[in-house]
């Protein structure tokens, strides 16, 4: 099966609940999933461009499937729009319109003056500083990347962080996108089994390892 790269959300990390859930599900079927640390341990210096470079190294110029949660979903779309080697994607509550919505949420003047802002980091379980370079860098990227690869979007109808209407509008404009609305919020952690069913079907994941087909040779 084509290698799978999972992109975690903003202020999260490789050990998030969804990332580990999907890693376990794929592993049970003999499929490896890579989960890069997108901030490379430097959250204050985080940028969209820097995260795209991390993805580039993980993909390595070879065919790949991208899975992304929230900001990770937006990053997956950005990357796929620029890299034809991405075969297909699974986007969970993708943070489309991220640059615009961040400009509306935070005062650029105050952020630039102070140099950084406090942000709760869910992966670390504590507050961290995020540098103004994040806002400067994000401004160069499109709100809704246009890609040609097949994509499955999973979005909670009760999402108050990234409203599901954003994904509904996006899917309505792009025939290569399949949208599944879930009875959940932004995190989607209470519908992971139904999500797995959708993901497994979309990616044509085998039910389990065919152990009878595995032979061992002894020299």
Positions of PLM-derived features:
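Short, surface-exposed "cap/lid" segments of acyl-processing enzymes
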Residues: 1-40
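Short, surface-exposed alpha-helical segments at coil->helix boundaries
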Residues: 16-20, 49, 163-168
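Aromatic pocket-lining residues of Rossmann-like dinucleotide-binding sites
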Residues: 26, 79-83
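Active-site loop/turn elements of alpha/beta-hydrolase fold enzymes
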Residues: 35-41, 94, 184
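Catalytic nucleophile-loop/oxyanion-hole region of alpha/beta-hydrolase
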Residues: 36-59
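Gly/Ala-rich beta-loop-alpha elbow adjacent to hydrolase catalytic centers
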Residues: 67-76
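The alpha/beta-hydrolase serine catalytic core
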Residues: 86-219
């Amino acid at each position: 099966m084509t290698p799978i790269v999972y992109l975690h959300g903003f202020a999260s990390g490789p050990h998030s609940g969804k990332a580990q859930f999907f890693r376990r599900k794929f592993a049970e079927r003999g499929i490896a999933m890579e989960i890069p640390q997108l901030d490379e341990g430097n959250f204050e210096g985080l940028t969209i461009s820097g995260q795209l470079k991390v993805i580039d190294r993980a993909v390595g110029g070879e065919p790949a499937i991208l899975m992304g949660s929230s900001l990770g979903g937006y990053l997956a779309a950005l990357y796929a729009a620029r890299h034809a080697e991405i075969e297909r994607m699974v986007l969970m509550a993708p943070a489309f319109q991220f640059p615009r919505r961040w400009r509306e949420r935070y005062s650029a003047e105050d952020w630039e003056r102070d140099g950084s802002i406090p942000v709760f980091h869910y992966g670390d379980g504590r507050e961290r500083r995020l540098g103004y370079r994040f806002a400067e860098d994000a401004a160069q990227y499109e709100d809704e990347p246009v890609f040609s690869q097949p994509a499955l979007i999973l979005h909670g109808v009760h999402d108050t962080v990234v409203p599901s209407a954003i994904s509904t509008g996006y899917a309505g404009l792009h025939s290569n996108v399949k949208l599944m609305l879930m009875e959940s919020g932004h995190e989607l952690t209470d519908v992971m089994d139904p999500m797995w069913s959708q993901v497994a079907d979309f990616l044509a994941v085998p039910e389990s390892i065919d152990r009878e087909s595995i032979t061992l040779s002894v020299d």
